[in-house]
Each structure stands twice: as structure tokens, then as C-alpha cells.
Amino acid sequence: MDFGEKFQFIKAKIHVIIRYSYRRDEMAKRRKLGRGVAIVGAGMSKFGMFPDKDTKDVFAEAFNEMLASVDKGVDPKEIEALYLGNFSNDFFVHQSHWGPIISDLIGHTPKPATRTEGACASSALALREGVFAIASGFYDMVLVGGLEEMSKRTTEEVAEGLALATVPYEGRVGFTFPGVFGAVATAYFAKYGANREHLMNVTIKSHNNAPLNPKAQFKLSIRDLMNAKAKSLEKKGIPVPEWQDEKDFLRDLKANPVVAWPMHLYDCCPISDGASCMLLVGEDIAKNFTDEPIYVAGIGQGSGRGLHSWDDMTYFEATRYAAEEAYGMSGLKPEDIQFSEVHDCFSIAELIHIEDLGFFKPGEGYKAVEEGQTRLDGPMPINTSGGLKCKGHPVGATGVSQLYEVWTQLKGKAGERQVPKKDLRIGAAHNLGGTGGTCTFTILERR
């Protein structure tokens, strides 16, 4: 290839890049909902490990709360379709086909019931499908939600089940979920100069929020856990380490063992059972059910590549794409978002996602957390619910449970964990499936 041919080749490539970038920007702006969609009711079960309950029990808990939350009342028979997220109950409890099972439970049959699967983002995908079904005008009212029952399996079995959400060969070579996010953390440390102390800041912040959430799986702060551990050791006649503060406790390898360096026990989310659901209606009929609907301002979805093709492990391509779509649809910018739930399956994930979503610049997320910017009383509260880390992570229920928190905050019903901002109008939820294979970002608005 001579110089002239090389020049023409490079010129053509530049034109393709410019055209593609322009098309992406324009398409994001054009992707508006043809009909506004509102959330008029929401419910969520308590998250945790429930040996005496099954999947239907916890979904009934969420569904009944949803019905009670509709200010002007609703007849379940008005629900025209069900979209239900579930990742792997076929593995965890040997039962698949959850759409019609839940449809029968709530008296919805013979109307349509569809199961969606996107690993940890399964129920967020259910909500996305429900939004589009309403926006198209095909339905006026749909129920969306998710569920998962994980506690009947051992930790090893749960790890095996969760590995189904990775590219087939990744788990076989040691890239379990903790392994992947351990590698992500080391890459982030190397690129930006962060360290394990900064991960501890995320953990401590989330554990401070969780005791304020009555539905959270873990309701103890790190200081509470430290004191409880000290009492337990003392009762057993074992010398108590001289922990000076929460970070001292988290540095102790006996109290906080390594899972996949630099991920330690308290950097990881738990095994959980739980369910969540929301009632969606067309914007034009929303006031028939409540005087204060919460509207879906924007929703985006992205997908990611297998780890072998990542050229940089310090960001998630799918998150950035989903955010671009949601911002384009809503006409909003990152600085318009007043608080957000993000997918903190591991502490490092929260740091990276708050950068990918545009809340902080790349490499600045860990500094923002250290400065207290993401605390409940900070300028950009993150994971007011306690996050996956403390609220719990019943995989198929997580996406809608994050939006339940955003809805609760925007309705002013979050109690002690209510974001202390005078005019709280816009919140968001970010949900990641697998090791970045599926991502959704949803923006809710109170008008």
C-alpha cells in the first residue's frame, strides 16, 4: 500500500468514526418514549436468607406492598401483562418458567407473563420491556418485577450458579466474580493510584446507610460489627485485637479475610433471597391512581464483551453506553442527577460506576468517596439503601429493588435515610449483569 492508498484508507476510517459518533449522538437524542410512563406503586420484600420461605412467599410480600402503595387503589385484574426478571432459579431451586407461576400466584392468568434474563440485570430488563410496552400504547398497565431464591444452596454451589453469567471459559481459568473484580481493582489501583484503604471507604459508607433501611439484609455498621466481634472473642476467652477504628478492623485478616485480592470479605455482597415489583401505567392515566406519580425520564441498555477483548479494565463499556442512551432519552446530564443507586456487587464496582455514569471524572471517584461526597448527606448520595453490599443481592430482584429505593426517595418516604435535599426530583439506578455483559441505567423523575 503506497502513501496515497494509506491516506485514503485513513481518511475513510476517520469518516466512519465521525459518522458513527454523530449517529450515536443523534440516535440517543431521537430515542424518546412515544408515550410517557409512570410508576404508581412499588413493593419490595425484605432481603436476606429465609429458610422457612420460598420464592412465592417473598414475591407475595413485595406484591402486597405494591398494592397497598397505590394511593387511590388498584384492582389487580387491571394489570394487562407481567414482565418478571429471574436469573437462575432453575439452578438454585430446580424450578424454571417463573412467569406463569407468579401470574397464577397473583391471579393474573391467562394474561401474558414473560420472564426476562440478564444475570444481575434481569429485573431491570423486565422494567425496560414494561416501559416500552406502555410507551408503545399496546398496554395501559403492566406489572414488572424480579425474584431470586439463593439461600438453599451452599456458598460453593451459589458460586457455581453465578458463574453461569460469565463467558464459558472465564470461570474455568479462575475468573470467578471475585476474581474478575479483584483484577479490575488492581488495574484501577495501578492506573489511578488508589489502594485498599479507598475500598474501605465505600464499605464503611454503605454499612452506615444500611441500618437505616428496614428491608436491608445487613443492618450493622462496620463499627457495630467490630464491637460485636470484640464481645464474641471476649466471651470465648480469646484476646481481643486493639482495633482503633473501622479501618483497623477491616485491615485485620482474621476479621476480614481475603477472597480474591484485593477483594476482602467486607468488599463483597452477600447471598440473598428476595423479590421486588413495580406497577407501570401510561402517563395520561397516572393521576387516576396517585396524585404524585414518579415518571420514567430515560432508560438505556448496553452490552459488553468477554474479558479476553477488554483493552482497559478500569471502566465498563456497557455502563457508558447505557448511560449515554438514558441521558439522550431524558435530555438530562449527569449533573442533573441528585442521587443514585449503583451496582456495587463489590466495593471497586461502585468506584468505577460512579465515574462511568459521569458523576465524577475517571480516576476521581475514589477521591469523592474519601471526601464524603457520596454519603447520605453529601452532594451526590450513592446507594442510600446500603447498596447490594448491605441491602442484599437476590440477583433477579436487584434491578427493580434499586428503582424501588429511588421511587421511595422521590416520594419522600425513605424515613431516616431520606436524602436531605429540599427539592429532590431526579434519581437514577444503575444495574450491571454478569461481568459487564448487560447493563441498564434508568432515570426517574418527580414532576
Spans of features found by a protein language model:
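Short glycine/threonine-rich loop-to-helix capping motif typified by GTGT followed
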Residues: 89-97, 308-312, 344-367, 394-396, ...
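Condensing-enzyme catalytic core mediating Claisen C-C bond formation in acyl metabolism
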Residues: 28-56, 163, 167, 171, ...
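Beta-strand segments within the central parallel beta-sheet cores of soluble alpha/beta enzyme folds
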Residues: 76-86, 112-118, 142-147, 197-204, ...
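Active-site-proximal alpha-helical scaffold in enzymes
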Residues: 117-148, 178-218, 278-284, 394-414
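Polyampholytic, low-complexity intrinsically disordered segments
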Residues: 204, 210-281
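Phosphate/pyrophosphate-binding loops at sites that engage ATP/ADP/AMP, CoA/4′-phosphopantetheine
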Residues: 64-80, 188-193, 288, 322-336, ...
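Short, Lys/Arg-enriched N-terminal segments with co-localized hydrophobic residues
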Residues: 9-26
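Conserved catalytic cysteine-centered active-site region
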Residues: 33, 89-145, 149-180, 240-270, ...
